[in-house]
Swiss-Prot record:
<dbReference type="GO" id="GO:0031410">
    <property type="term" value="C:cytoplasmic vesicle"/>
</dbReference>
<keyword id="KW-0378">Hydrolase</keyword>
<dbReference type="InterPro" id="IPR000008">
    <property type="entry name" value="C2_dom"/>
</dbReference>
<dbReference type="GO" id="GO:0009395">
    <property type="term" value="P:phospholipid catabolic process"/>
</dbReference>
<feature type="binding site">
    <location>
        <position position="43"/>
    </location>
    <ligand>
        <name>Ca(2+) 2</name>
    </ligand>
</feature>
<protein>
    <recommendedName>
        <fullName>Cytosolic phospholipase A2</fullName>
        <ecNumber>3.1.1.4</ecNumber>
        <ecNumber>3.1.1.5</ecNumber>
    </recommendedName>
</protein>
<feature type="compositionally biased region" description="Basic and acidic residues">
    <location>
        <begin position="442"/>
        <end position="457"/>
    </location>
</feature>
<feature type="binding site">
    <location>
        <position position="43"/>
    </location>
    <ligand>
        <name>Ca(2+) 1</name>
    </ligand>
</feature>
<dbReference type="GO" id="GO:0005509">
    <property type="term" value="F:calcium ion binding"/>
</dbReference>
<keyword id="KW-0968">Cytoplasmic vesicle</keyword>
<dbReference type="InterPro" id="IPR035892">
    <property type="entry name" value="C2_domain_sf"/>
</dbReference>
<feature type="active site" description="Proton acceptor">
    <location>
        <position position="549"/>
    </location>
</feature>
<keyword id="KW-0963">Cytoplasm</keyword>
<feature type="region of interest" description="Phospholipid binding">
    <location>
        <begin position="1"/>
        <end position="178"/>
    </location>
</feature>
<feature type="binding site">
    <location>
        <position position="93"/>
    </location>
    <ligand>
        <name>Ca(2+) 2</name>
    </ligand>
</feature>
<dbReference type="Pfam" id="PF01735">
    <property type="entry name" value="PLA2_B"/>
</dbReference>
<keyword id="KW-0106">Calcium</keyword>
Amino acid sequence: MASIDPYQHIIVEHQYSHRFTVTVIKATNVTKGTFGDMLDTPDPYVELYISSAPDSRKRTKHFNNNINPVWNETFEFILDPNQDNVLEITLMDANYVMDESLGTTTFPISSVKPGEKKQVPFTFNKVTEMILEFLLEVCSSTDLRFSMALCDQEKFFRQKRKNQVINGLRKLLGPEKTKDLNPTSRDVPVIAVLGSGGGFRAMIGFSGVMKALFESGVLDCVTYIAGLSGSTWYMSALYSHADFPNKGPKEINKELMNNVSHNPLLLLTPQKVKRYIEALWKKKSSGQPVTFTDIFAMLIGETLIKDRMNRKLSHMQEKISHGQCPLPLFTCLHVKPDVSELMFADWVEFSPYEIGMAKYGTFMPPDHFGSKFFMGTVIKKYEENPLHFLMGVWGSAFSILINRVLGVSTNNQGSTMEEEIENLKPKHILGNDSSDSDDEMQEPKGTENSKAEEEYQRNNQASWVQRMLMALLGDSALFNTREGRAGKVHNFMLGLNLNTSYPYSPLSGLCTQQSMEEDEFDAAVADPDEFEQIYEPLDVKSKKIHIVDSGLTFNLPYPLILRPQRGVDLIISFDFSARPSDSSPPFKELLLAEKWARMNKLPFPKIDPHVFDREGLKECYIFKPKNPSVEKDCPTVIHFVLANLQFRNFKAPGVPRETAEEKEFADFDIFDDPETPFSTFNFQYPNEAFKRLHDLMEFNTLNNINVIKQAMVESIEYRKQHPSRCSVSLNDVEARKLLHKDSQSKFQM
């Protein structure tokens, strides 16, 4: 049964590409013509060009003064067999000033049959003969995984983690309430912790949360930790730390406090800027897109993980290989240049095992993200992106608004990050750069020879470095227009077929019509056009895609946890989002998450915003399914908000503050303080501000441990009554007609 994938072929129509291999063997009697040969002996090389191929141009090396060159160089092209693919072959002569074409011919690739290898002679100028060898193969496997199911590594992790969770639940809840739990039972609840965005405020708040969860034993019962923007920065710092989990958050948080106490402008010394620019130029010249997000990523990395800038997302596998820690999940959005993020956004999820988009069922190993793809096959592989680059992408709202981060004054600043973002147009974030342009420093016909090109590249690099330096120092339109700040990577879905777009969930019937009507499905939470185009597909013709901070649509990473395949029973979410004041209702982001879930047919408890009117501001709120027997797959949500309530009077749960110093330390507002020490744009935290925010969220979490424990007990009882939480029959799978008949029969066995 493990080999059957019930979701394969549901979203992306799986099609096969062709690998076309060309070997340029040799040429004889290369000539420039009678008069040309009298002046100079040819220095020949060959250019290959297929306009329909994504990596369209290749060339051999050149030989000096050789009329009978032997190259024996082999090149590969990935092709769409449904297109009219034609190979253009050009014989070139390398010159000091300008290379010269000695002739061009074409070859229809359709004349080669799949599996066939053959040599073909070509004639140039009636006397020159060139021999090429062709091989056409069907790419029967791809570098993308097409599926809605979890990858094998995550399934293996879940089984390993299940043993840890059982032990954690027994320690936390006692033997009586966990006596029936065992590794083979299906009544072990899946628990997830969520952290919102909110800059360093979210990162520091989440550090206090994680310390409380770690030391209380709750973290031992958790299967997933999902973060967005600022929370991902803490998760990155924690999971990339060499001593975690042997060293707990308490010690690691002290290091973090020291790191964020310095002014971020100290990272812009000439020596460091030079190092940043050199790294960015190296990336750009290799053919990868570079935007201001890359610069911000280096700044955030130098601040938070400066001693491990070479760490990568895949390195976190060692922290979870035996289920010893919860699986960390990170997120960003794929957005379109001409559409608001609230209207259209695809959620991209990152784990140490895979990166992909569940909406389309397309996933890849972390070391493939950023590489060039065509029809699911890697056509140009790059090194895995460093973790700090991903941190910059996950929190890229701050690279978009970096003038606020660095304290550069402008004439048009909103008072909050939300106001700033509302003033942004997609074209301001993404700029006018065409996502279909190639970044490689290619040599079109007639370019200068290698020495002349080296000089050109040096001048080009110097000019580019100068522009980026000017941008960093603030004397640039980048700071005023915010253009070109979104992250950008090669489109890993280039060339795929998306004939039909489906909702996020492959399951039907998860929400009853009655509940949909009761929930006022179409009611606007933040904007009349919110989520209007979420069913629209990605543009599979664009060579690059823009990726931005997920907080630009809503500020909680629920889409990662609500995937039906993860079957999460209990969600403990921590919202550090900005509010107009400390007394403002704290449910905006949660309501957006609820609406998104309903629109994607995912079970979610009814969020009643009027609970704030009835009960006032609290440290946490609980939302459960109204009718568990009907909403049988609906998780329970414990929603913590950023509020300084009992912390003012208690230094630990049940331990009153006594001294004036203790009371003064806890007497602070978060959003009402006119000095705005906890602003979303504050990237420098003195030790006292750090401790206040850290200790507040640690206290709030510990103060509600009994609420969490009770929800765990209820989740265990619920699992006993409904053990097959994520059981799926073939009749529940939308678009099951796309499944092959043999797959259907195997799945139904």
